[in-house]
């Protein structure tokens, strides 16, 4: 006899779009990153250091979510001339993340920044500044 399956996010035949911010960011950090690059991103964190970010009308608060990858895909195969060292070739990755978040209903301004370390000279942080509407919705749903 035919059993009707309950609609849930874990049902691949009837997936639901996630409406909570943290779960969406975790999806980008793991699932989307694995599909695009073959491995999950190295780190997902939230910064609340107000002196690190420019205040803008678009941004919800002076907090930002960051996805870090120690060995970014596009930086591996490209060499940037010294006169263009401010160029971040991972801006393409930031655009993909921004498009994914926009498509999921989480508008944000997403940028890429190289944060070199001795161990990882191409280490890149994808900085996510969410739209005010996202944070208002998250607060209304009982989030942070």
Summary of predicted features, one role per range:
Residues 1-87, 133-144:
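N-terminal accessory segment detector
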Residues 52, 102-104, 118-120:
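A generic structural signal for short, solvent-exposed coil/turn residues
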Residues 58, 65-66, 108, 124-126:
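A broad, low-specificity signal marking well-ordered, structured residues that form hydrophobic/aromatic
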Residues 84-91, 120:
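Intrinsic disorder
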Residues 92, 105, 121-123:
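Eukaryote-biased feature marking scaffold/signaling PDZ-domain proteins and nuclear chromatin regulators
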Residues 94-107, 111:
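Mixed-charge, glycine-accented linear interaction segment located at domain edges/termini
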Residues 112-128:
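Beta-rich nucleic-acid/ligand-interaction surfaces
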């Amino acid at each position: 006899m035919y059993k009707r399956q309950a609609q849930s996010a874990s049902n691949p035949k009837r997936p639901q779009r996630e409406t909570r911010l943290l779960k969406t960011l975790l999806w980008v950090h793991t699932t989307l990153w694995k599909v695009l690059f073959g491995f999950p991103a190295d780190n997902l964190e939230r910064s609340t250091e107000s002196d690190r970010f420019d205040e803008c009308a678009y941004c919800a608060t002076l907090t930002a979510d960051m996805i870090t990858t120690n060995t970014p895909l596009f930086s591996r195969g490209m060499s940037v001339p010294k006169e263009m060292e401010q160029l971040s070739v991972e801006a393409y990755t930031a655009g993909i993340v921004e498009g994914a978040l926009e498509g999921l209903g989480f508008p944000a301004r997403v940028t890429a920044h190289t944060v070199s370390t001795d161990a990882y000279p191409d280490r890149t942080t994808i900085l996510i500044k969410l739209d005010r509407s996202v944070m208002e919705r998250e607060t209304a749903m009982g989030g942070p």
